[in-house]
């Protein structure tokens, strides 16, 4: 598969699916959490994707690419933290928490791989297809 946009990256697809699942689950959380936990976890989970898209747009410059990937990774860690709060507040059951936490860890691992070896993703590297099909 040829990578034409950030949307083609497996890490983007996984992060997007995670954000959408968090959105669906959080719709049933108490109204008093609307502007705190619910808002925070939705924003953080969505920011993983938006920062990844920004990183992709800035891949002409390695430092900018890495900076935005780092932001994406940070938002993923924040999402994981909010999942812990949701569990401890009784808004998530342990099986949903475990499953979503595993998804966060997988996204983090994929982002970590990109951070360790950013060169295949940079614009000056023509052969994106063969080197990025697993992410």
Give names to the regions the model predicted.
Residues 1-135:
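Short, C-terminally biased terminal segments at protein or domain edges
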